[in-house]
């Protein structure tokens, strides 16, 4: 919803807002912010708030400006009612007022506009898993999960229930639209699902979701971890991304796989044909690759309606448009880059008329099906060699993202205790 400056001033006064967070994500999807006082809002809207971007946005070694996207106004509900805190997601500009080319949120918006010009409407949603761990007397995290519950368990086996409920209520109060939540397969493992919305809103929701989960978990005496594979013998935590693409108000994925349209087949083919190339962005940690192939986590580049382990799954339900779910990503990804990659890959498939091979029910064990990269090191190489990746993200972002990932790989190889290295980095 668009808010004029007058609307914002009235909202701030009526809700006793005393603090405004100007929020953005760094290159790797980590939430960053500068807080301003309400009296500075006019300057933020008209001139922008300057900040030193060195070290935060890897491709930038300069001062930049933050300007609020006023449509993203949201109250942070865990702060007191008196002296409330709100946040905006921000647009990034150079000091001369020109758009900053490394603004990944803007880049996703431009991809959305490109789809719209071609006659397509797109919505995206997420299902994101996380673990809750106990904390010690000092409030520091332990590696002890908060319960021994399993899939869809209820209390008393599910000791996450109250925390999960508070997270959902906070998300709803912020306007982030969670739909369902449950206990997952692992001890202390949870999942919260979001309603589909436009890709930019979905990425904003995912970016802020992690902050909300960690904040509410801490208030309940737990530590929330999005580490992709914290336990060797338990399910990992992934980020499943739903895409619903329409043309002429009809889903290109039909209402069942039997009426999957040629455009829908080409869109899926586009993603499958490029998935290896953008895995560095969707799975940017050493630990991400330990999750692949364990239980329901995909390891091969296949698609299906019926089985639960493909990379891309067709989703059909009564009264709903057909959609697809991309299943390999994890919460450490930058959602703006990852969502842009998925949309761009799918549209490239349509533009090139790419054919979708028939392996609807192929299992992960089928050696004839290509695999996802086996390591972050392999993913880096594939991204650097990819013409698709270079045409989708700015060269400076690719260079610095790859360099940072390579530093991570080098540090891992030098680590005396690889497991301790991963926990220190990703837990």
Language-model region placement:
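Flexible loop/turn segments at secondary-structure boundaries
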Residues: 27-32, 97, 132, 187, ...
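Short, hydrophobic beta-strand segments
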Residues: 88-94, 190-196, 243
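Catalytic-core signal marking the mid-to-C-terminal active-site face
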Residues: 208, 215-216, 222-223, 246-298, ...
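Short, contiguous, pocket-lining structural segments
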Residues: 155, 159-163, 180-186, 198-209, ...
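A generic structural motif
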Residues: 26, 93-99, 156, 196-202, ...
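Active-site-proximal beta-alpha loop/turn segments in soluble metabolic enzymes
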Residues: 144-154, 187-202, 231-236, 248-253
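Core alpha/beta catalytic barrel or barrel-like domain that forms the active/cofactor pocket
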Residues: 124-134, 143, 174-194, 224-242, ...
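ATP/Mg2+-dependent ligation/transfer catalytic cores
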Residues: 1-181, 202, 222, 337, ...
């Amino acid at each position: 919803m668009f808010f004029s400056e007058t609307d914002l001033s009235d909202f701030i006064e009526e809700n006793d807002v005393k603090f405004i967070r100007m929020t953005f994500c760094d290159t790797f999807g980590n939430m960053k912010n500068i807080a301003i006082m309400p009296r500075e809002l006019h300057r933020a809207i008209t001139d922008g708030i300057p900040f030193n971007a060195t070290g935060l946005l890897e491709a930038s070694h300069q001062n930049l400006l933050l300007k609020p996207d006023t449509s993203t106004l949201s109250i942070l509900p865990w702060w007191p009612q008196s002296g409330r805190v709100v946040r905006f997601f921000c647009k990034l500009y150079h000091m001369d007022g020109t758009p900053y080319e490394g603004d990944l949120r803007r880049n996703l918006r431009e991809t959305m506009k490109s789809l719209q010009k071609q006659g397509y409407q797109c919505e995206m949603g997420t299902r994101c898993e996380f673990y809750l761990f106990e904390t010690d007397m000092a409030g520091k995290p332990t590696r002890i999960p908060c319960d021994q519950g399993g899939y869809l368990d209820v209390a008393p086996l599910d000791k996450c229930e109250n925390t999960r409920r508070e997270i959902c209520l906070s998300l709803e109060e912020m306007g982030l639209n969670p739909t369902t939540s449950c206990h997952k397969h692992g001890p202390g493992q949870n999942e919260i699902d979001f309603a589909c919305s436009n890709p930019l809103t979905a990425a904003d929701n995912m970016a802020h979701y992690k902050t909300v989960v960690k904040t509410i978990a801490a208030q309940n005496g737990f530590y929330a971890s999005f580490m992709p594979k914290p336990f060797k013998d338990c399910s990992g935590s992934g980020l499943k991304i739903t895409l619903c693409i329409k043309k002429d108000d009809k889903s290109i994925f039909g209402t069942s796989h039997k009426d999957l349209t040629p455009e829908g087949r080409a869109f899926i083919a586009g993603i499958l044909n490029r998935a290896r190339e953008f895995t560095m962005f969707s799975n940017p940690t050493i630990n991400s690759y330990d999750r692949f192939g364990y239980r329901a986590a995909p390891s091969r580049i296949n698609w299906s309606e019926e089985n639960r382990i493909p990379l891309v799954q067709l989703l059909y339900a009564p009264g709903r448009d057909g959609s697809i779910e991309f299943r390999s990503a994890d919460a450490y990804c930058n959602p703006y880059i990852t969502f842009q990659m998925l949309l761009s890959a799918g549209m490239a498939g349509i533009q090139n008329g790419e054919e979708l091979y028939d392996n609807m029910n192929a299992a992960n064990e089928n050696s004839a099906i290509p695999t996802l990269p086996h390591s972050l090191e392999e993913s880096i190489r594939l991204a650097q060699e990819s013409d698709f990746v270079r045409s989708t993200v700015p060269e400076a972002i690719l260079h610095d993202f790859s360099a940072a990932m390579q530093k991570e790989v080098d540090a891992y190889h030098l680590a005396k205790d690889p497991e301790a290295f991963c926990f220190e980095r990703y837990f």
